[in-house]
Amino acid sequence: MKKKPIYLWVLLILSALISATSLFGMLSPLPSKEALRAAQKQVAGVSAQQLEDQLNYTYRVAESTHSIFNIALIVLSAILVVVAIVFLVRKNLQYANYTYVGYVLLAIIGSIYSYVTLQDAVQLVQDETMSLGISVVSKAVSILYIVINVLFLALVFYKMWRQQKALAEEEETEDLA
């Protein structure tokens, strides 16, 4: 390949940043309900029940980020990003692409898992308006993340197809010569 895979470098750098922040979040300790309650501020117009709902929701979300499955997803995705970068540095573009595809598929699974755990946390909220708002936002964010990952996946597949096509044309030209 004569062209440099800038698209893959950009995607991998973004993915490395995301993986690093996820690892940092995973390594931070799970806050206690008391610590979360102390950090809560009393806002005018917000009932005690809404504050308690927010506390329960926040704690459940924090618990889900420290679950074994989520930790496995984060560690595996970080490993895949590092492996893809190593392949890219060693100029093994095909393996770098395949590894990045694996990372994106894992990210889609992670987005679906996050959505499911957020919906579980929404069940703790008793205020219907607050519950509806949280539910809608979590659906929108999950859909957005999945769409972005599918676009990244489409870009990588398109580039892989173009690379294979260029390689086939190059081989055909060599056969004719």
Describe each region flagged by the PLM.
Residues M1-A38, L155-Q164, D175-A177:
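Cytosolic juxtamembrane helix and N-cap/initiation of the first transmembrane helix
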Residues M1-L12, R60-N70, R90-N97, L132-S142:
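Membrane-water interface of alpha-helical transmembrane segments
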Residues K2-K4, V86-A96, L118-V122, N149-A177:
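Cytosolic juxtamembrane helix at the C-terminal end of the final transmembrane segment
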Residues L12-F24, L76-V81, A107-G110:
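Canonical alpha-helical transmembrane segments of integral membrane proteins
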Residues K33-S67, Y113-V141:
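Interfacial non-cytosolic loop connecting adjacent transmembrane helices
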Residues R90-D127:
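Hydrophobic alpha-helical transmembrane segments of integral membrane proteins
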Residues D127-K165:
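Alpha-helical transmembrane segments and their immediate juxtamembrane flanks
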